Amino acid sequence: MPNNYRIAKVSSLLKKEITLILQNDLENDLLRSNFISISKIEVTGDLQFCKIYISSAAEGNIRKEIIENLNLAKNYIKHILGQRIEMRRVPELTFKDDTALAKGLSVLKLLEELNNKTHNQNSQVEENNDNV
């Protein structure tokens, strides 16, 4: 049975170290020119696999390219992690696009459009009432 405390501790450590690696050790213009952050890390109970969810304000194609670049660099990142943290085995890394931010922004945009539409309809009704 997996030790949830250990998984949480390893997840926290991985998030901290991977963030530092992304900021300081990767020399990738695409990553440096776009703000990216780790929104969530999921580590399996046996600590063999780790999914890293990346959020970014970049547009769709650029987001995909960022994730592709990170997945291409995952062995290098894993190597650096192995040097920095004491674990028998560093988990296999997989970078995923966290679309929660983009979905949230699209919901806010829809709500704003709905609010504007309602406001415009109310203005027209008031204008019609004034003309009567």
Swiss-Prot record:
Localization (cell): Cytoplasm
Gene3D superfamilies listed in its UniProt record: 3.30.300.20
Pfam family name, one: RBFA
Keywords, alphabetical: Cytoplasm, Ribosome biogenesis
Chief site of localization: cytoplasm
GO cellular component labels: cytosol
GO biological processes: maturation of SSU-rRNA
Domain of life: Bacteria
Family under the similarity heading: Belongs to the RbfA family.
PANTHER family the UniProt entry points to: RIBOSOME-BINDING FACTOR A, CHLOROPLASTIC-RELATED (PTHR33515:SF1)
Subunit structure: Monomer. Binds 30S ribosomal subunits, but not 50S ribosomal subunits or 70S ribosomes.
Protein name: Ribosome-binding factor A
Organism: Prochlorococcus marinus (strain MIT 9515)
Upper lineage: Bacteria, Bacillati, Cyanobacteriota, Cyanophyceae, Synechococcales
Gene name as annotated: rbfA
